A protein has these predicted regions:
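Conserved nucleotide- and phosphate/pyrophosphate-binding catalytic cores
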Residues: 1-85
């Protein structure tokens, strides 16, 4: 699996949503991107990867709610900075 490519796909997906998108819908998109990028069998690893990049930890809050609270653009900026895109 190409982890960086999967995260880039997540960022691209986040760029298509608005700040007003409900947290549940954001969470659904995160699951969909994970499944599309080879994490269907182990979504736990997908979220672990997101947490490691975003927070430097293996665990974290529900990402849909975090992104909704922190901000879509702010989350994208944070992830791009961590990935050095």
């Amino acid at each position: 699996k190409n982890e960086k490519k999967a995260l880039e796909n997540l960022i691209a997906s986040l760029k298509k949503i608005s700040q007003k998108t409900p947290p549940e819908e954001i969470q659904t998109k995160i699951y969909a991107v994970g499944k599309e990028n080879g994490y269907s069998d182990n979504l736990r690893d997908w979220f672990k990867l997101i947490y490691e990049v975003t927070f430097g930890e293996e665990n974290g809050p529900r990402m849909g709610f975090f992104i909704s609270f922190f901000g879509v653009k702010e989350t994208i900026d944070l992830m791009e900075k961590k990935l050095q895109i």
